[in-house]
Every structure is written in structure tokens, then in C-alpha cells.
């Protein structure tokens, strides 16, 4: 078989073909019937597709490269609270996952949709669902914001444009926060209305949130430390009626992504106190 002549036109055709869609070098070799060294040389200056891109060509691997939208700000917050980054046994492939209660499964579906991820939601048999995507690029971007393997010991509030910080806080709140607004009977048979917003997490993260709320809303609450298993965590509580109202107004202002059950409790709180 005569040796194929590699013209400049053929080289450009091969480059264009490779860039037309995610594919392996082997696929290019087979199409043009050229050796691996030849194809590698022709494509040496072209960025290669990652394993994640090959397996899931439509996925937005660069979703967290820059925090510049409600969607990536909110899911960054949710990952800070309820996310996990881990490597496979080889240490070369990173995965990013979020685990939520089954009643919040729709948020896992939303995450899947915004990433265009071709993956399924898994279930642990204990009332939780999980979505996991493989991407070294995404893991590297998230590391810039403190979402790293074993992050539970090191989380903090990252520096991002202030216009997106409330979306991040809402994501953290939906993951590791709680809101209470309900009547509770007293010993005399009458009801009192309980209300509270709280965050739990590392002392650094709670201090960061406390400082942010002080700077932006003049809140004076400080986190308290408590022992949890083999480590210490902190809790930040907001119990003043006006502060809870102001907090809710800010985290839900213009929001389209949030856990419905927590937002409903905030609406119940507003209704009980006739707050507008």
C-alpha cells in the first residue's frame, strides 16, 4: 500500500474534523488510516478532549470557571454545604457529587439539567438521592472556592462578586441551614410561635457568614462552637423577627432556584407576623 502523502490541506482537514465534535485520537486514526504518531504530531497544538467530555460531550465542564450567574452561584453554595469532591482509585479522575433528601430530589434534577450532564440520580436506600459527575476541570475550578476533597474541615465563604453572594448564601442555607416557623403549645395550653434561622458548619464558614451579614445587614449574631463526633462545628442562629424577615427578603430577592419547602416556611413566618 503506497504511503499517504500528508499535505497541509490534509493536516487542516484532520484538525477541523477533530474539532468538529468530541472524539478520541483512535477515531481520527481509523478515519484517515494514519498511525498514532502521525495523528499525534498533526494534533500536537490542539487541546485534547477530556475523558469527561468524551463520555458526556454536552456537559458544561467549565460551569464553575467564573461565578457570574444565579445558577452557578447557587449550586456553588449547595456544593459548599452538601457537596463532595473525590478521586478514583488511580487518583487521576475527579468526581463531584451532591446528596440531598429525597423530598428535595428535584434540585438534583435541576443540577443535572443546568450542567447538561448525562448521568442518573442514585439512591442510598436511606431516604437520600445523589448525583455525581466526573470532571477534573470542574473539580479544579471548584477548588478555587474551597470545594475540595475532605472539605468538611476547611469550608469558608469564597470571595465572589457581591451581586451573586446572596445566591451562594441561599445555596449554603438550603444545604446546611434550617428555618423554623410554627406554633408550639405552652404548659398553660396556649400556643407560642417559634421562629429561627440557623446555619451549621465549620467555624471559619460560620464566622464568614456572620461577618458578611454584619457588613451588609448590620446583624450582630455570632456563631457558637459545639462538639460533633470527632471535631468541632459552629452554629449561627438568627432569632430576631426583624432580622429573620430581612434575611429572607435578601436571599429570596429575584431568586428562581431554591428549596420550595424552606421558602414556604419563610412565607408562613411572614404571614404569621403580617410582614409584607
Model-derived regions: residue spans:
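Internal intein/HINT superfamily modules and their associated LAGLIDADG
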Residues: 1-276
